[in-house]
């Protein structure tokens, strides 16, 4: 059974979200407990702790441009995980008790049984951004207790960090392309963002919507979402890279080339993976304009910045092939395969999932290169 359900997302819609600060936690404290006896189930505190930590670690392991939270297991009892009785769970005291002003995000899960039905109470808080929340998650038909606990942990993370959770869900389902939960989570989270012209968070979500449009093969929609993401935050480098990627999909090679030239000029200290992607995208645009020699030079820069970029080596092999150097093309293509087991790119970058195109009227095609961690999820 899939660990995610739309029930999780519907409950999110009623969560009160404060938007005075960026919507991403720096620290998440996990708390777990059991309340009362649960018939025919053998599960102890260590098992619950491990399941909770495993699910949150899986989400936090997503290769993202946004800072990831430091995750720690808290001592049982903080965040109100002390339950008076199994029959009085709604009186849970989840108020945070910190002597100083800083309050880390907290997620608590309490496994219990009520009228013979196994349930998990998910509670938590997100500092100034997310008020205290409480949600009961009921075991579904055919769902194991372990899967129930994984789902509960996912719900908790969706409350305190909907962006990272949506990003993780998108990557989990890139093979079966069932993005319904990720898309609904994005829609609900965006609905909580103030309609200001500039929004760091809205830009991140719009960028994800562009990638999801590419998964559906809708090039025009993807271009629109990436353009909106850049408008919401012009400093969102992922959105600018992806907008150029979408330019290529629409055969707008000059626009893509100009966009990448400006980006690389304006951000000389850009992250190596992003800068290399910028040069590769620029090279693809040059190929689309039949400028093979300049594409050759641009790709040399991409490789110099990030020698482990498979897409850069692969694109360079294509340039050599077009120049008639088949021996060099084969060597460079082999090098692309040799470095394919290293970090390729961030989850927000379209080139991680799809091939850069330099030929007219091409459909969206999946890339043969991806991150090693992403491969292990399928």
Features from the language model and the residues they span:
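Short beta-strand->alpha-helix linker/helix-N-cap micro-motif
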Residues: 26-117
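Catalytic-center loop of serine/cysteine hydrolases
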Residues: 75-183
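Hydrophobic/aromatic packing residues within the alpha-helices of TPR/SEL1-like helical repeat arrays
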Residues: 186-190, 226, 253, 260, ...
């Amino acid at each position: 059974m899939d660990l995610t359900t739309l029930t999780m997302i519907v409950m999110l819609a009623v969560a009160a979200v404060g938007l005075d600060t960026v919507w991403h936690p720096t620290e998440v404290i996990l708390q777990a407990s059991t309340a009362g006896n649960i018939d025919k189930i053998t599960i102890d505190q260590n098992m619950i702790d491990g399941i909770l930590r495993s699910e949150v670690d899986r989400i936090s392991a997503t290769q993202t441009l946004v800072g990831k939270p430091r995750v720690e297991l808290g001592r049982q009892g903080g965040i109100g995980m002390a339950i008076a009785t199994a029959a009085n769970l709604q009186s849970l005291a989840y108020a945070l008790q910190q002597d100083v002003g800083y309050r880390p995000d907290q997620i608590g899960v309490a496994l219990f049984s009520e009228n013979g039905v196994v349930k998990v109470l998910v509670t938590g808080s997100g500092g100034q951004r997310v008020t205290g929340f409480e949600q009961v998650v009921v075991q579904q038909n055919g769902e194991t207790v372990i899967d129930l606990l994984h789902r509960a942990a996912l719900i908790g993370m969706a409350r305190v960090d909907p962006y990272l959770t949506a990003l993780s869900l998108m990557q989990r389902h890139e093979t079966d392309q069932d993005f319904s939960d990720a898309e609904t989570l994005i829609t609900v989270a965006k609905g909580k963002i103030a309609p200001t012209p500039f929004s760091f968070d809205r830009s991140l979500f719009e960028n994800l919507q562009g990638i999801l449009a590419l998964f559906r093969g809708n090039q025009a929609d993807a271009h629109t979402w990436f353009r909106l993401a850049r408008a919401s935050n012009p400093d969102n480098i992922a959105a600018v890279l992806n907008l150029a990627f979408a330019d290529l999909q629409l055969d707008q090679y000059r626009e893509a080339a100009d966009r990448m030239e400006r980006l690389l000029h304006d951000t000389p200290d850009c992250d190596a993976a992003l800068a290399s992607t910028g040069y590769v995208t620029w090279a693809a645009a040059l190929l689309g304009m039949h400028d093979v020699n300049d594409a050759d030079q641009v790709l040399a820069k991409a490789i110099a910045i990030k020698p482990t970029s498979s897409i850069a080596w692969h694109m360079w092999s294509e340039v050599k092939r077009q120049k008639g150097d088949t021996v060099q093309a084969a060597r460079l293509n082999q090098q692309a395969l040799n470095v394919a087991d290293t970090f390729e790119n961030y989850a927000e970058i379209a080139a991680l999932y799809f091939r850069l195109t330099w030929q007219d009227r091409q459909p969206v095609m999946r890339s043969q290169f991806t991150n090693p961690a992403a491969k292990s999820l399928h």
